[in-house]
Amino acid sequence: TNGQASCLLAYGQSRKWGVWNAYNRVPIFIKCGDTTASWAPQGSLGVSNNSTNNKITPTVGLPEEFLDCTFTQEVALSIAATSAIQLGIGFDSTTVASGRTTIVGAALSGGQTITVAAWTGTARYVAQPSIGIHNIYPLDKLTNSGTVAGGEDDMLLLVTYRG
Protein backbone atom coordinates (compact mmCIF):
# COMPACT_ATOMS: atom_id res chain seq x y z
CA THR A 1 0.00 0.00 0.00
CA ASN A 2 1.30 3.47 -0.86
CA GLY A 3 2.64 5.45 2.09
CA GLN A 4 3.53 2.41 4.21
CA ALA A 5 7.03 1.19 5.00
CA SER A 6 7.90 -2.34 6.11
CA CYS A 7 10.70 -3.21 8.50
CA LEU A 8 10.88 -7.01 8.55
CA LEU A 9 14.06 -8.26 10.22
CA ALA A 10 13.01 -11.61 11.72
CA TYR A 11 13.76 -14.85 9.84
CA GLY A 12 11.36 -15.63 7.00
CA GLN A 13 10.70 -14.88 3.34
CA SER A 14 10.51 -11.48 1.59
CA ARG A 15 12.40 -9.62 4.31
CA LYS A 16 13.01 -5.89 3.93
CA TRP A 17 14.00 -2.73 5.70
CA GLY A 18 12.03 0.09 4.10
CA VAL A 19 13.38 3.22 5.85
CA TRP A 20 16.65 5.14 5.80
CA ASN A 21 18.15 7.46 8.43
CA ALA A 22 20.81 9.65 6.84
CA TYR A 23 21.78 11.42 10.08
CA ASN A 24 22.01 8.58 12.59
CA ARG A 25 22.95 5.40 10.74
CA VAL A 26 23.09 2.22 12.80
CA PRO A 27 23.96 -1.38 11.86
CA ILE A 28 21.04 -3.25 10.26
CA PHE A 29 20.98 -7.05 10.08
CA ILE A 30 18.31 -8.59 7.82
CA LYS A 31 17.97 -12.38 7.69
CA CYS A 32 15.98 -14.47 5.26
CA GLY A 33 15.35 -18.11 4.47
CA ASP A 34 12.89 -20.82 3.56
CA THR A 35 11.23 -22.87 6.30
CA THR A 36 10.55 -25.86 4.01
CA ALA A 37 12.22 -28.92 5.59
CA SER A 38 14.24 -29.85 2.47
CA TRP A 39 14.20 -29.70 -1.33
CA ALA A 40 16.26 -30.72 -4.33
CA PRO A 41 17.70 -27.68 -6.12
CA GLN A 42 17.07 -27.27 -9.84
CA GLY A 43 19.65 -28.18 -12.51
CA SER A 44 20.60 -24.58 -13.27
CA LEU A 45 21.46 -21.72 -10.93
CA GLY A 46 18.23 -20.25 -9.55
CA VAL A 47 16.51 -18.98 -6.41
CA SER A 48 16.51 -21.46 -3.52
CA ASN A 49 13.47 -23.75 -3.50
CA ASN A 50 12.48 -22.10 -6.81
CA SER A 51 10.71 -19.34 -4.83
CA THR A 52 11.32 -15.65 -5.54
CA ASN A 53 9.89 -14.99 -2.06
CA ASN A 54 13.33 -16.02 -0.78
CA LYS A 55 14.84 -12.54 -0.91
CA ILE A 56 16.00 -9.54 1.08
CA THR A 57 15.16 -6.02 -0.08
CA PRO A 58 17.25 -3.36 1.71
CA THR A 59 16.73 0.37 1.21
CA VAL A 60 19.83 2.54 0.79
CA GLY A 61 19.33 6.32 0.89
CA LEU A 62 22.88 7.48 0.14
CA PRO A 63 25.49 5.79 -2.07
CA GLU A 64 27.95 5.46 0.84
CA GLU A 65 27.13 2.06 2.35
CA PHE A 66 28.42 -1.38 1.37
CA LEU A 67 25.91 -4.24 1.53
CA ASP A 68 27.62 -7.30 3.05
CA CYS A 69 25.69 -10.39 1.85
CA THR A 70 26.31 -13.93 3.14
CA PHE A 71 24.42 -17.11 2.23
CA THR A 72 25.00 -20.26 4.32
CA GLN A 73 23.27 -23.55 3.47
CA GLU A 74 23.41 -27.12 4.77
CA VAL A 75 23.76 -29.64 1.94
CA ALA A 76 23.12 -33.41 1.94
CA LEU A 77 24.28 -35.52 -1.01
CA SER A 78 23.40 -39.13 -1.80
CA ILE A 79 26.30 -39.99 -4.03
CA ALA A 80 26.87 -42.82 -6.48
CA ALA A 81 28.73 -40.59 -8.94
CA THR A 82 30.00 -37.05 -8.97
CA SER A 83 27.40 -34.88 -7.20
CA ALA A 84 27.60 -31.24 -6.22
CA ILE A 85 25.51 -28.28 -5.16
CA GLN A 86 26.57 -24.74 -6.06
CA LEU A 87 25.54 -21.87 -3.79
CA GLY A 88 25.57 -18.19 -4.70
CA ILE A 89 24.03 -14.78 -4.10
CA GLY A 90 21.89 -13.10 -6.74
CA PHE A 91 22.23 -9.33 -6.52
CA ASP A 92 19.20 -8.02 -8.45
CA SER A 93 19.21 -11.33 -10.34
CA THR A 94 17.47 -14.69 -9.89
CA THR A 95 19.88 -16.61 -12.18
CA VAL A 96 23.33 -14.96 -12.03
CA ALA A 97 25.56 -15.15 -8.95
CA SER A 98 27.60 -12.17 -7.77
CA GLY A 99 30.73 -12.39 -5.65
CA ARG A 100 32.14 -15.63 -4.29
CA THR A 101 30.13 -18.78 -4.99
CA THR A 102 30.86 -22.13 -3.42
CA ILE A 103 30.51 -25.68 -4.69
CA VAL A 104 29.87 -28.44 -2.17
CA GLY A 105 30.21 -32.03 -3.33
CA ALA A 106 32.25 -35.11 -4.03
CA ALA A 107 33.70 -36.88 -7.05
CA LEU A 108 33.55 -40.67 -6.97
CA SER A 109 34.68 -43.29 -9.46
CA GLY A 110 34.96 -47.05 -9.76
CA GLY A 111 31.59 -47.91 -8.20
CA GLN A 112 32.20 -46.07 -4.92
CA THR A 113 29.13 -44.75 -3.09
CA ILE A 114 28.36 -42.50 -0.16
CA THR A 115 24.93 -43.01 1.39
CA VAL A 116 24.57 -39.47 2.75
CA ALA A 117 27.23 -36.81 3.07
CA ALA A 118 26.42 -33.50 4.78
CA TRP A 119 28.32 -30.24 4.40
CA THR A 120 27.73 -26.57 5.04
CA GLY A 121 28.60 -24.15 2.24
CA THR A 122 28.87 -20.36 2.30
CA ALA A 123 28.69 -17.80 -0.50
CA ARG A 124 29.54 -14.11 -0.01
CA TYR A 125 29.14 -10.85 -1.91
CA VAL A 126 29.97 -7.32 -0.81
CA ALA A 127 28.01 -4.88 -2.97
CA GLN A 128 29.58 -1.54 -3.80
CA PRO A 129 27.75 1.57 -2.55
CA SER A 130 24.68 2.49 -4.57
CA ILE A 131 21.40 4.26 -3.94
CA GLY A 132 17.90 2.76 -3.97
CA ILE A 133 16.48 -0.67 -3.25
CA HIS A 134 17.95 -4.00 -4.31
CA ASN A 135 16.63 -7.56 -4.33
CA ILE A 136 19.14 -10.07 -2.96
CA TYR A 137 18.41 -13.77 -3.53
CA PRO A 138 19.94 -17.05 -2.26
CA LEU A 139 20.82 -19.18 -5.30
CA ASP A 140 21.46 -22.91 -5.63
CA LYS A 141 22.13 -25.48 -8.36
CA LEU A 142 22.23 -29.29 -8.18
CA THR A 143 24.39 -31.66 -10.24
CA ASN A 144 23.12 -35.27 -9.94
CA SER A 145 21.39 -36.12 -6.63
CA GLY A 146 21.14 -34.27 -3.34
CA THR A 147 19.02 -32.02 -1.15
CA VAL A 148 19.37 -28.87 0.90
CA ALA A 149 17.69 -28.13 4.22
CA GLY A 150 15.50 -25.19 5.21
CA GLY A 151 14.92 -23.39 8.47
CA GLU A 152 17.10 -20.80 10.19
CA ASP A 153 19.47 -23.46 11.58
CA ASP A 154 20.23 -24.82 8.08
CA MET A 155 19.65 -21.96 5.61
CA LEU A 156 20.46 -18.30 6.20
CA LEU A 157 20.79 -15.35 3.84
CA LEU A 158 22.12 -12.41 5.86
CA VAL A 159 22.57 -8.81 4.68
CA THR A 160 24.27 -6.25 6.92
CA TYR A 161 24.78 -2.53 6.34
CA ARG A 162 24.35 0.84 8.07
CA GLY A 163 21.12 2.71 7.50
Where are these predicted regions, by residue range?
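Terminal beta-strand-rich extracellular "head" domains
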Residues: 66-131, 139-163
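Short, conserved, surface-exposed binding loops centered on an aromatic residue
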Residues: 57-63, 78-79
